[in-house]
Design a protein with these regions (language model features):
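Alpha/propeptide regions of enzymes that mature by internal proteolysis
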Residues: 1-297
Length: 297
C-alpha cells in the first residue's frame, strides 16, 4: 500500500500502530509509534517472508531519486501465518516480487479474496484473503473518507450483521476438535484524509479492533492482530529535509473524531466480510484444501 504517490521517505505521513494482540511480526512499529509517522510503503506478506519484504522496501526506497544520502529506512511489513495452504518454509516470496508489487500499485479498486498476501489465509474456517471497504462522512461531519484494507487469517464464530453465521453453518472454532484452530492473525490498515495526528490516529486504530470483534473474531492466543492507521492529509506530511523550525499543522479536534471512529468500525467489519465473500476454494500445500464461504447457503 502506497500512502501517497510521492516519495514516502521524503514526505512521511502521520501514523500510529495499535496491537490488539501482539503474536505477529510487524516491522517498524516501534519507530512509527515513537516518531508518529510512516516513511515507506506498507507491505503485507506471510510470516517467513518478512525479511524479503523488508529488503524489497529498503531497495525501493534507496533507489528513488533524491534518496542518495538516505542511510536509514524504517520498513513497515506486516504478516500472517498461512502455513496450512502455503509452503511457508520454502520462503518463495522474493525481493523482486515486492519491488514488482510496489511498481505496479495503482489507485484503482482493490482486488479482493485469495490474492497477494491473502492467497493462503484462512478465516473462520473458510477461505480468507484480502478485503477492503470505505466510508465517507457527510459534509456536515467534515466529508472525510476512511478506507480499510485487511489480510484476514483468524478464527472465532463468523458473525454477519449480528447473525452467528458460523453457528448456523456448524463451522466455528471449538465446535469440535477438528475446528479448534483460531490462530493465524489479522492485519488491518486504516487510511484517512482527515487531518489526524499520531495520538488521534492511535485512537482511530483502536476502534478498528471493535470492527474485528463484530465479525466474531476473538484475538486468540496465537493470533496477531495489528492495526496500522495513517493520515494522507498533505499539509501534515513530515518532510525529510527541514529547517528545524516549527511547522503549523492541522489537527481535527477531539470532539470531531467520533464519526471517524464509527466509520472505522463499520469499514473494518465490512472489509473482513468482503475478504470472505470474494475468496474462492483453494487447494494448497500438500493438497490441503479450504472451502469458500457457502454464500448461497
Amino acid at each position: 500500500m502506497m500512502p501517497h504517490t510521492g516519495d514516502v521517505v521524503q514526505q512521511k505521513v502521520p501514523a500510529a500502530v495499535y496491537s490488539g494482540h501482539g503474536f505477529v511480526n510487524l516491522t517498524g512499529s516501534t519507530q512509527v509509534n515513537e516518531l508518529g509517522n510512516i516513511e515507506t510503503p506498507i507491505v503485507l506478506t506471510n510470516t517467513l517472508s518478512v525479511p524479503a519484504a523488508m529488503n524489497g522496501l529498503i531497495s525501493y526506497t534507496l533507489a528513488q531519486a533524491g534518496n542518495e544520502k538516505i542511510s536509514s529506512v524504517n520498513a513497515v511489513v506486516g504478516e500472517t501465518n498461512d502455513g496450512f495452504l502455503n509452503d511457508i518454509r520454502g520462503r518463495h516470496v522474493t525481493e523482486q516480487n515486492v519491488l514488482t508489487a510496489i511498481q505496479s500499485a495503482t489507485p484503482n479498486k482493490v482486488i479482493e479474496g485469495a490474492v497477494g498476501a491473502g492467497t493462503g489465509t484462512v478465516c473462520f474456517g473458510f477461505k480468507g484473503g484480502i478485503g477492503s471497504s470505505s466510508r465517507k462522512l457527510p459534509a456536515s461531519l467534515g466529508g472525510y473518507t476512511i478506507g480499510v484494507l485487511v489480510q484476514s487469517n483468524f478464527g472465532g464464530v463468523l458473525t454477519i450483521n449480528g447473525i452467528a453465521v458460523g453457528a448456523y453453518l456448524q463451522k466455528f472454532s471449538f465446535s469440535n476438535e477438528l475446528l479448534n484452530n483460531v490462530d493465524g492473525s489479522c492485519m488491518i490498515i486504516v487510511a484517512t484524509d482527515a487531518p489526524l495526528d499520531h495520538r488521534n490516529l492511535m485512537r482511530l486504530a483502536k476502534r478498528a479492533m471493535l470492527g474485528l470483534g463484530r465479525t466474531g473474531g476473538i484475538a486468540s492466543n496465537g493470533s496477531g492482530d495489528y492495526v496500522i492507521a495513517f493520515s494522507t492529509a498533505e499539509q501534515n506530511r513530515v518532510l525529510h529535509q527541514t529547517n528545524n523550525l516549527p511547522k503549523p499543522l492541522l489537527n481535527l479536534p477531539n470532539d470531531a473524531t467520533s464519526p471517524l471512529f464509527m466509520a472505522a468500525i463499520e469499514a473494518t467489519e465490512e472489509a473482513i466480510i468482503n475478504s470472505l465473500l470474494a475468496a474462492t476454494e483453494t487447494i494448497g500445500f500438500k493438497g490441503n484444501k479450504v472451502a469458500a464461504l457457502p454464500i448461497q447457503q
